């Protein structure tokens, strides 16, 4: 089967702005802005133009690493950041100003919006989940788990909530009650990351066993696995049509596979372990960031975007 996209003809561009390594990259809902969160305690918002030029604005205020960030799914200029300083902040990407702040109980490492934009879920290093009401920016639900909780996600309709765990399971909870519905024995080692396919048919899970599994959301059954990586899978993302999945780890490449066949269609070479990959919601542009160092062994503070027709 011929692939629809000639990946081999596409190029990556590099964006420099942070003083230390970038932990997280995320696109806004219109695909026009990309945010990057860094160990340098800042986030930056980049206005990416179709030919790849960018203007950026700095979001300053956190006093520890910005570990993950996510955009309001209904508002192209509102972004939430999670930091090791125990706060979660809401920002206006036009002004660069922090509009809301919530002080939570631990070092925050995971954050995700409910698809309707009303709630934000935050996970911390102590395996505690906090749900914030976005309007008041106050916690409406807190739950501590007795096992390691990694990346978290809602399904497209917002009535199911997924937790990836250190036990190799995916816990499926009914939302908003957070009532356990299912435990999926997904992998032989810890599950680190999860992505929901934009068509709503599938979700994918990346694991320490180096595999990515693809699950049918209505049946809760594993459809196939992607086996190209050899190291623990740190980050995964579906493209906007749901036809391709990108996955990355400490392997020195990002794998892009066809979701329907399971076959690799392209590999993007990397110079370091990757922390975050995310496809643009409107175009086949893949942002990625990792532990890149310069020749003096200092963090480069860069991210890249793959998918441009010229370098």
Feature-to-residue mapping (PLM):
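A short beta-strand motif characteristic of beta-propeller blades
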Residues: 12-14, 55-58, 97-101, 138-143, ...
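WD40-repeat beta-propellers
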Residues: 43-48, 88-92, 129-133, 170-174, ...
